[in-house]
Amino acid sequence: LSKLRLYQAYEQNDTHKVVNINATRLQEVITYADQVTGAALEPDFGNNFLYGYDNGPESIWAAQFSKNDGTLVSRVSFVTGLNSPHGTGLYGCCGFHLASQNMVNAFKTNANGLPLLDTFNQVDIFNVVDGSGKTPLASGVTLDPRIDHTVGIPGRPFKYRNRISNADDMVYNFSWARDPGVYGYFGNMKEQQAPDCSCYVKEGPFVGTSKNIDFIRYADVLLWKAEALIQLNQVSQGLAIINQ
């Protein structure tokens, strides 16, 4: 309900232009968010995206998956598997759900770690493609560290690993992309697991995982509340929540 009320607070006309921000709805956002009890942020942000931490303190609403549960191929998420890197033998098919260049550029920050709201897309995060399939960041570029939980970037460790069997075989490479000329060079990483994870089931070229999919995390609830507070001119309270 908190999420619903936040959408409803931004009242629109027939052309979808916001014409009013409903303070009563915003207050309801806060009220419903405060009713979420017993939850907390994960001590390590990466735990939210790793097998072994399902239904943790930050998980509010999640699709549940399982393996070795007596079914033919287990109740695993093959949807997630369809998004695994397509161009490496470590995974399977099919390399969908990729980050755009615009999205990746949006992770750029200034020297203080704050987002570049107006200028982030003026320069791409890298502008050199080297022969090894990796690339350095463009000069002077700094990134929000959450990008390394989210997107496979050439030359950076994939899923917190450098190696599975051979040196650097888990360092994301241009060759991992399905069709770089069409889809770009970035990989789907947040919802993937390391290929040696016991959570994986392989059926032909497809891989499924028993890792749950979180639809709502406690972090989302906190941000809904923070947005409502800021819109109600309670900026310091909203910022305190954001900076947790």
Q: Each predicted region: which residue ranges?
A:
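Substrate-binding cleft of carbohydrate-active enzyme catalytic domains
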Residues: 1, 5, 222-225
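C-terminal substrate/ligand-recognition segments
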Residues: 136-244
